[in-house]
Amino acid sequence: MYLQGFGNYHHSEAVKGALPPNQNSPQHCSLGLYAEQLSGTAFTRPRHNNLRSWLYRILPTVTQGTYYPYEFNIMQPFVDELSPNAMRWSPLYNSSQIKCDFVEGLFHIAGSPLVNTYTYYCNHSMSDKYFANNDGELLFVPYAGEIHLHTEFGKLMLSSGSIAVIPRGVKFKVEVISKEAKGYLCENSGNPLTLPQLGPIGANGLANPRHFQYPVAAFENSGSEHTIICKNQKKLWFTVCNHSPLNVVAWHGNYAPYCYDLSLFNTINTVSFDHPDPSIFTVLTSESEIPGVSNLDFVIFPPRWMVAEHTFRPPYFHRNYMNELMGLVYGEYDAKKEGFIPGGISIHNCMTPHGPDYESYEIAASQDLKPNYINSLAFMFETKDYWQVTEQAYRHPSRQMDYLNCWQGFKIEFSQ
């Protein structure tokens, strides 16, 4: 069961009477609870993008204890001098017999001043272990397996083809439902993700607000030992407390985790000719200080009909002002016939040329242009700042050193 609607002011209580009926902070909360506000923006942000929630807890967060350095380097150093070459990786993970939870399975791929991208692998649930990110919100894009995200606000269920966002500072743990789970993770330290403006598209289309789902209140009331791991200023810290941090019995507000089924994305595409720009596939965006230039765009290339007439239908050859990190959830990407599979990654930074490989080009340039259904789901994390690649990703054996060869079949066909 979920609450529906992106950015709505929701309220939920796991025990009847836990929510104060007429105010936020009564002198004495009912059921012996404590009132605590969680702010996602400054108090004085305009009303339409002011984010906060009130939580009614068994114990306030100040009782969590003292944090100490945690011996795990989640942030990895970047390559000092990064070439303008296109880069691509095969999936980093194979199945492991070693127990590995969500935090232990994080692999830092690349970053920019306000955005970082990781992959995750886990085959073991976080039973009495919790995670929070003070540096930014987390966008989950799974490509294999199923997980449940148990958060301070309630539970989200997540599998391939769906996404979830955990806001900055919200504590959660990952329960692995399948044998193992794999996915992509994007950390956004800029403005919180929101729905893009639709412009001439109109009032409806792309990701509709009604399809975003928020958790109903659920709580843990355990007196055993619990470990909280917190990412703060690019480092991990831990504390051990004698209660679960997921002790919120009721809440109300508009700052909360949410999930979304990508199959509900209302895809906009041409019904005449040419390939529209990929901005029409934007699901969520983090606005920067420059209008129309995003700190982060989350873009998908979902299952869709291709019907353009007298047109080269795959994505065109391109050199871009923005910086692209791509992944594949399932299927075969229509611009890459080989080498780009679920779990893979490609990075094309500002002005780095990219486009269909030679085999894809040959097929698309000569095919009979009947309506064609593309049954795949690729995505892109697009930023205004260069993706700096970590040393561990740059030197990882899954990096395809021969990636540029996919364009070497092109030959001069110009004639006067």
Curated annotation (Swiss-Prot):
Species of the source: Legionella pneumophila subsp. pneumophila (strain Philadelphia 1 / ATCC 33152 / DSM 7513)
GO annotation, biological process: L-phenylalanine catabolic process; tyrosine catabolic process
Listed name of the protein: Homogentisate 1,2-dioxygenase
Gene3D superfamilies, A to Z: Jelly Rolls
Active site: H275
Catalytic activity: homogentisate + O2 = 4-maleylacetoacetate + H(+)
Names of required cofactors: Fe cation
GO cellular component, one term: cytoplasm
Single GO MF descriptor: iron ion binding
SUPFAM superfamilies: RmlC-like cupins
Family assignment from sequence similarity: Belongs to the homogentisate dioxygenase family.
UniProt entry keywords in alphabetical sequence: Dioxygenase, Iron, Metal-binding, Oxidoreductase, Phenylalanine catabolism, Tyrosine catabolism
Associated pathway: Amino-acid degradation; L-phenylalanine degradation; acetoacetate and fumarate from L-phenylalanine: step 4/6
Assembly mode: Hexamer; dimer of trimers.
PANTHER family assigned to the protein according to its UniProt record, in alphabetical order: HOMOGENTISATE 1,2-DIOXYGENASE (PTHR11056:SF0)
Enzyme class (EC, first level): oxidoreductase
Role played: Involved in the catabolism of homogentisate (2,5-dihydroxyphenylacetate or 2,5-OH-PhAc), a central intermediate in the degradation of phenylalanine and tyrosine. Catalyzes the oxidative ring cleavage of the aromatic ring of homogentisate to yield maleylacetoacetate.
Binding site residues for homogentisate: Y333, H354
EC number(s) stated in the UniProt entry for this protein: 1.13.11.5
Any matching Pfam family: HgmA_C
Residues the entry annotates as binding Fe cation: H318, E324, H354
